[in-house]
């Protein structure tokens, strides 16, 4: 089971170590609000694709307000000069949600080499620049262990190196206990748009066992 399902979704729950990316409560309009959250997340990722965003957490504490927490490697790109970019984003979300109370919090990801989303985006960006996929994968693995990662698995699928037949290649180093629910495993995917087609990148990073009686966000 742990080998097939998404490592993040497998560990989401009130008694487990992962949390949802959208936190809201609605009796009748849950579907509408959830679709809104998806559109907001897509908008942020498209506008600031160079900021290497790790996670967008959307909270709705009431019917009149929305709180958006953005974790990114390069927060300055999202903020902009004198806060111009974040003001544009706030106005766009106000027009989309029809809410006047929109709060945006931006957090810098310091240990970005053990953040699966950022690692996957970095590998995809290197593949688009025609860097060898083996070199990109091995560089990511080495950098992960330097920042405290205990295990990492990287997979690339597609026409690797311009080959006519698509294939999948992967590297794994360290531990990767996918069946252990208390294992803190970060998982993410990315796509590299190359001249030969799309190459899919998957990254699993094991950060150790979570032993405290507290949920990991």
From Swiss-Prot:
UniProt superkingdom: Bacteria
Which Pfam families does this chain map to? KH_2, Ribosomal_S3_C
- Provide GO CC annotations from the record: cytosolic small ribosomal subunit
Q: Which residues form the KH type-2 domain?
A: 40-110
An annotated Gene Ontology molecular function: structural constituent of ribosome
Which positions form S-S bridges? none
Q: What keywords are annotated for this sequence in UniProt? A: Ribonucleoprotein, Ribosomal protein, RNA-binding, rRNA-binding
Query: Which SMART domains does this one have?
Result: KH
What CDD domains does the record tag this protein with? KH-II_30S_S3
Q: Which SUPFAM superfamilies match?
A: Prokaryotic type KH domain (KH-domain type II), Ribosomal protein S3 C-terminal domain
A GO BP entry: translation
PROSITE patterns, A to Z: KH_TYPE_2 (PS50823), RIBOSOMAL_S3 (PS00548)
Which InterPro entries does the entry link to? Answer: KH_dom, KH_dom-like_a/b, KH_dom_type_2, KH_sf_prok-type, Ribosomal_S3_C_sf, Ribosomal_uS3_bac-typ, Ribosomal_uS3_C, Ribosomal_uS3_CS
Q: Which NCBIfam families does the annotation name?
A: rpsC_bact
* UniProt family annotation: Belongs to the universal ribosomal protein uS3 family.
Chain's role: Binds the lower part of the 30S subunit head. Binds mRNA in the 70S ribosome, positioning it for translation.
The subunit structure is: Part of the 30S ribosomal subunit. Forms a tight complex with proteins S10 and S14.
Q: What is this protein called?
A: Small ribosomal subunit protein uS3
